[in-house]
Structures are given as C-alpha cells and as structure tokens.
Amino acid sequence: MSCFPVLFVMMLLASQSVWAFPEPETRIGTARDAESMGVRSAVEECCENPVCKHTSGCPTTG
C-alpha cells in the first residue's frame, strides 16, 4: 500500500524531467505536451543540451 505514493511521486518527477532523459516511447508525447503548455524555453534549452537535443521537438541540425 505504501508503494502507491512512491509511484505517484516518481511519475510526477518523470513527467517534469522526462525531457532531460528522453525515451523512444515518450519523446513524441513529451514534445506535444511541451508545445501545448507553451514551455518553449525548456524545449529550447533541451535542444541545446547534447543529451536530449535528439528529441522530435527539436530541429535536426546536422
């Protein structure tokens, strides 16, 4: 019973920071969520980050 709060918190943390650690099955949904919420600065920072600039929401430059 105590694992439910832990899972809930982990899901919240994952949804907040999933752009920093993109997974193949979550990249597209995360990009859409970011656009719908208008968090453009976070997306731009992500695109500048060599770790997560490969997300579908970032322009592929070379």
Swiss-Prot record:
Organs and tissues of expression: Expressed by the venom duct.
Annotated signal peptide: 1-21
Organism lineage string: Eukaryota, Metazoa, Spiralia, Lophotrochozoa, Mollusca
Main localization category: secreted
Comment, domains: The cysteine framework is I (CC-C-C). Alpha4/4 pattern.
Protein name: Teretoxin Tsu1.1
Organism whose genome encodes this protein: Terebra subulata (Chocolate spotted auger)
Family: Belongs to the teretoxin A (TA) superfamily.
GO molecular function: toxin activity
Localization annotation: Secreted
Key word Disulfide bond present: yes
PTM annotation, UniProt: Contains 2 disulfide bonds.
Keywords, sorted A to Z: Disulfide bond, Secreted, Signal, Toxin
GO cellular component, one term: extracellular region
Coiled coil, from the record: none
Propeptide stretches in the record: 22-40
Keyword Chloroplast: no
